[in-house]
Regions:
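Sequence/fold signature of self-assembling virion shell proteins
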Residues: 2-29, 33-49, 69-78, 92, ...
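Structured, hydrophobic secondary-structure cores that serve as assembly/anchoring elements
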Residues: 41, 61-62, 69-97, 147-178
Length: 296
């Protein structure tokens, strides 16, 4: 009887859990995602550049010998679980279980996926970092910094399509109050980002991140009332994501788990996530430093 009810609960709440999970993952649809269901590691392969050769009549056609560059992604296993006491949710009243699943567990899983991606982005070497004071900048991210990030990606033949700029909301606040953006009327293009919408600006699709409890965007406290964030100007295929448990991309596997735990007198509501990410092309990611006032 209890097993049947548990399965009914999963069928009832799983679609909503998946929707909330995706809605709370700002970066979930940005980078290429691989189905690694049942695996602890996942290998992705990138092909290097090849240079053609001039045609010589009667001669053999030489091979370009483009390199094969494998990268192994290690998946991290996370539980996002809450116990719901029997007295809070009887087998007939599922409201407490539903609230735990959709308001606590699923959002936490979505934020964790973002954090795994952010942590992987921050592993890129400092070769192409843009300093917070580039070209005389005083705070936030300037027009020149955006242009320079775009130029660096273009210099390395990174495709123009699917370029993203990932930054915290505190950077957006400064951009919207900076004279150079306002006078060029770019403020009109940026303002929808205040509502969490994806905006196109300066050759990038901009995504602004909240200060999530999982860690959020990497930063350094300058101990002077300011912090310096690591932001990222990057291409969609510069980083690969692998998702096992919690894969909602057509695997048919429920994301929600509801288990009865008699010794605790509770239901265990869980949105497990097995996920990993790795940089596959260093030249496709530019770390941009942004100095902003610290927020409580």
């Amino acid at each position: 009887m209890s097993y049947t009810i548990t399965q009914a609960q999963i069928r009832k709440f799983d679609p909503e859990v998946k929707g909330v999970y995706q809605a709370n993952s700002r970066l979930g649809g940005v980078f290429h995602e691989n189905n690694a269901l049942g695996a602890s590691t996942y290998q992705v392969t990138r092909l290097g550049y090849g240079i053609g050769s001039i045609s010589v009549p009667g001669a053999d056609i030489p091979n370009m010998n483009s390199a094969t560059l494998p990268t192994t992604i290690s998946l991290e296993n996370w539980n996002h679980a809450e116990y719901v006491d029997y007295f809070q949710a009887s087998e007939v009243n599922w409201d407490a279980i539903g609230k735990s699943a959709t308001e606590v567990c699923a959002p936490a899983a979505g934020r964790r996926k973002d954090q795994i991606i952010i942590n992987a982005l921050d592993q890129v070497p400092a070769t192409y970092d843009i300093a917070w004071n580039y070209a005389g900048n005083a705070a936030g991210i300037s027009e020149r910094m955006v242009q320079h990030a775009n130029a660096l990606l273009s210099h390395h033949a990174v495709p123009f399509e699917d370029r993203y700029f990932i930054a915290p909301y505190s950077v957006l606040e400064i951009m919207l109050s900076t004279q150079e953006f306002v006078t060029r009327q770019w403020v009109g293009e940026l303002r929808p980002a205040l509502e969490g919408k994806l905006v196109n600006f300066g050759g990038f699709k901009w995504i602004f991140m909240a200060n999530n409890p999982e860690g959020g965007m990497p930063f350094i406290d300058n101990n002077d009332g300011t912090v310096t964030y690591n932001c990222f100007a990057c291409h969609k295929r510069a980083l690969e994501v692998a998702v096992g448990e919690g894969n909602v991309g057509g695997s048919g596997v429920p994301m929600l788990r509801i288990d009865r735990v008699p010794e605790k007198g509770s239901w265990l509501v869980n949105a497990p996530l097995s996920c990993g990410a790795a940089v596959v092309e260093n030249k496709g990611i530019i770390r941009v430093k942004a100095k902003v006032p610290a927020m409580a």
